[in-house]
Amino acid sequence: MRQVLAAADKEGVRVSIIPFYNDYIPTHPTIDVVGRTKLIDMRATPLDNIGCAMFKRAADIACSLALLLLTSPLMLAAAVGVRLSSPGPVLFRQKRVGKNKKPFYMYKFRSMRVTGTEDTGWSTKEDARKTRFGSFIRKYSIDELPQFFNVLKGDMSLVGPRPEIPFHVNHFKEEIPLYLVRQQVRPGITGWAQVNGLRGDTSIEKRVQYDIWYIENWSIALDIKILLRTVFGGWVNGEKL
């Protein structure tokens, strides 16, 4: 190989090679150098760039602060409605799995009656645990507003794969080979899968495909597109996690 490269350089000819592991190399590989050894990052993403990651985090903080101020009257009304609808706390805290598989507590306005089964699975439209007011705030995703506090804390991002409970993560990682790739970024309040109709009791395999596509193709423009689709119809109706 050295002789071939030397001969090509002598003649001013560019050389391209097909490595024996060609099938595994990503479309846009990132090369790291450790000592004299070159390493190919097999799953590099745009958010690996510290500048991109810092910009996204700064945007999350600024936008979540602004949205908390804008929605504070609505959140106050929701809190009163939850309190009057059924006995129990206003906020529902549920353990979810975040970036790098780190667990955190995600906040929601409580939409169900207090039982011992709220941590076990997804809700459906016919779920008897939901209160009438709870169904209303779920329909318009008002129950998700407290997650702006999760964004401020750094547990979540405005946009990213939706976080799931540890039980589901432990199950799906055995069934879906690329499932844990989702955990390489902060989970989001909304995501590419969700605005494409994959929410609640829908195909997990398709959801993972959309989540990984988002991670590999992240851009500021894509986040803005997802947020706009969320506001103008992508986040209304249907059942959520």
Tell where the protein language model's regions lie, with residue ranges.
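N-terminal hydrophobic signal-anchor/signal peptide
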Residues: M1-S72
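A short, structured surface patch at a secondary-structure boundary
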Residues: S123-R186, I226-T230, G234
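Short glycine-/acidic-enriched loop or helix-start segments at secondary-structure transitions
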Residues: M1-Q3, P26-T27, V80, R93, ...
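Thr-Gly-centered strand-to-loop micro-motif
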Residues: M42, F92, V159-G160
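A hydrophobic, helix-centered structural microdomain
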Residues: G51-G116, N150, I220, K225-L241
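Short, glycine-rich, amphipathic interfacial segments at transmembrane boundaries or analogous
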Residues: P19-D23, H28-G35, F92-R132, T190-R207
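Short beta-strand/loop motif that positions the catalytic acidic residue
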Residues: I212
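Short, conserved catalytic or interaction motifs in soluble domains
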Residues: P161, G197, N217
